[in-house]
């Protein structure tokens, strides 16, 4: 299984070698807030990805400076006009858990798989609405049934005095 994943990664890299844009970023944050939830202390959050004809593939991570809370996200996005489609794999590990990235057992994995869609009204009025739903991985109710957790976001970008 691991060999297949490595082979797929190599093939994807070769396919995107002619990418229009490769990006590498790193943020240092005093606290990690995700979708309004406190998800960690001071962290470094690097990312690596590439854009090609509306398709974006990237890896993003977060690791705390003091604790052993880590996150590795793999994401795929496709943008066409004002519509964006998302597929995300979030992997989290806490200090109490061993690092088992390749554990995909539905009730013990650190992975959460999510799909979503976002739509922006127009460039002149860039109000966006997005919806994401978890469909696999670590997302269960107390009774053991899949939770199908969903998140909706309404956003409008703005600046304050050219900041």
Indicate residue ranges for each PLM-predicted region.
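Histidine/lysine/aspartate-rich catalytic loop segments that bind and position anionic ligands
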Residues: 135-137, 144-149, 155-159
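Short glycine/proline- and aromatic-enriched beta-strand/turn motifs that initiate or cap beta-hairpins
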Residues: 20-65
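Residues on the lipid-exposed face of transmembrane beta-strands in outer-membrane beta-barrel proteins
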Residues: 26-28, 46-52, 74-78, 115-119, ...
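Cleavable N-terminal export/targeting peptides
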Residues: 1-21
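Short loop/turn motifs that connect adjacent beta-strands in outer-membrane beta-barrel proteins
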Residues: 19-21, 54, 122-127, 158-163
């Amino acid at each position: 299984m691991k060999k297949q994943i490595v082979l797929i990664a190599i093939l994807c890299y070769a396919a995107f070698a002619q990418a229009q844009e490769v990006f590498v970023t790193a943020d240092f944050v005093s606290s990690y807030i995700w979708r309004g939830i406190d998800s960690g202390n001071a962290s470094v959050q690097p990312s690596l990805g590439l854009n090609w004809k509306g398709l974006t593939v990237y890896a993003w991570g977060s690791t705390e400076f003091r604790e052993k809370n880590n996150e590795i996200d793999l994401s795929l996005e496709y943008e066409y006009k004002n519509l964006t489609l998302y597929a995300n794999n979030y992997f989290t590990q806490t200090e109490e858990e061993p690092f088992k990235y390749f554990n995909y057992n539905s009730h013990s994995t650190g992975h959460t798989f999510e799909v979503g869609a976002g739509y922006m009204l127009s460039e002149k009025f860039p109000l966006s609405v997005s919806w994401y739903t978890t469909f696999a991985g670590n997302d269960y109710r107390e009774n053991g049934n899949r939770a199908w957790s969903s998140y909706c976001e309404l956003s409008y970008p703005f600046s304050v005095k050219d900041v």
